[in-house]
Every structure is written in C-alpha cells, then in structure tokens.
C-alpha cells in the first residue's frame, strides 16, 4: 500500500513538512482547497487526510464541512476523548458517538455516496486500565464500527478495516437506511 499523509493543520504540517493550514483558508474556498490537497489517486494509493474540528462545534463546523466535502473521503475515523462533555470554550454539549458518526457520514455522502465510517479512535486516559478493553468493546457494539485507543494499542485494527476495502460494510449499510425515531 502507498499512503500519503495530507496535513491540514499547523501541527500536522510540522510533522509532515508540508500541507495546507485549512483553517487559514477563506471559508468559501475550503472545499476547493481540500480537493486540491487530496487529488484522485490510483486504487492502491491512500491519502490520509488530517481531520479538523467537528460538525458540532459552533465555531469550526464550516472548516470541518468544507474539508469533508472537498476531500470526498472513502472512509472516515471519528476521534473522541472519553469524558469530554463539550468543546473547549463552548457550553454546547457534545453529541453521542452514534449521532456524531451518522451526521459526519450523512454530510460526507453529499460528495461521496460510498463514504463509510471505519472506526472510532478514543483517548481512554480517564478509563481505568482494567476497564479499558470492556469499554472499547461496548462502544464498538453501540457504534457498530471498530473501536480502539490508538495511544495504547495502536491503530492496526482501524488499518485492517480500511484494507478490507468493502464499498459498504454491513453495519454502515444498516446505518445508512432510514431508521424510525423513538422518543
């Protein structure tokens, strides 16, 4: 596999030595900048695009949406810190991980209908070591995707899911179908 890290933030640019600080791009041009950053490639080449912010952050959602629409990803990984209840500096509560996955996939499918969420990466520093595995398994069952703490166990399970290369995993196909809402 050939892979290129596409940095979109200042820290990523320092690590990679190149990239595009997407938060410095005028909002109207964010999607176009993201598209330039991640051109079409051969099937055996992966662009790993550094994500920014969240669709749920009142100050940075436009950056996230532009990056999501412009890069037109085939797969996304949702990242979260266990115990975080709101975005820094905001009183708006964070959504449940399932809602977060559903919203990011729905918005991403506007420009790539085949988009799927391949996993959740959690920072579990607040979870006792003896409870970590059970916690990750519970989140995986609830979200129906692979769940790891890459800081503890590495990202191999997420990479394995990416390598499966299926157009739509069964869990994502079920999630994509309209679901009845309950009160």
Identify the function of each model-found stretch.
Residues 1-183:
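Flexible phosphate-sensing "switch/lid" loops adjacent to ATP/NTP-binding sites
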């Amino acid at each position: 596999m050939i892979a290129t890290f596409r940095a979109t933030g200042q820290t990523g640019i320092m690590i990679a030595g190149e990239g595009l600080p997407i938060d410095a791009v005028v909002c109207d041009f964010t999607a176009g900048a993201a598209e330039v950053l991640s051109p079409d490639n051969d099937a055996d080449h992966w662009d790993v695009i550094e994500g920014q912010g969240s669709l749920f952050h009142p100050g940075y959602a436009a950056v996230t949406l532009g990056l999501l629409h412009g890069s037109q990803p085939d797969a996304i990984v949702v990242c979260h810190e266990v115990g975080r209840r709101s975005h820094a500096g905001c009183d708006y509560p964070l959504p449940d991980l399932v809602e977060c996955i559903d919203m990011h996939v729905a918005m991403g499918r506007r420009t790539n209908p085949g988009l799927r969420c391949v996993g959740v990466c959690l920072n579990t520093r607040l979870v006792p070591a003896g409870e970590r595995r059970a916690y990750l398994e519970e989140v995986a069952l609830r979200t129906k995707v692979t769940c790891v703490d890459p800081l503890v166990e590495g990202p191999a399970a997420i990479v394995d899911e990416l390598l499966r290369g299926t157009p739509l995993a069964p869990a994502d196909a079920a999630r994509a179908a309209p679901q009845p809402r309950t009160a």
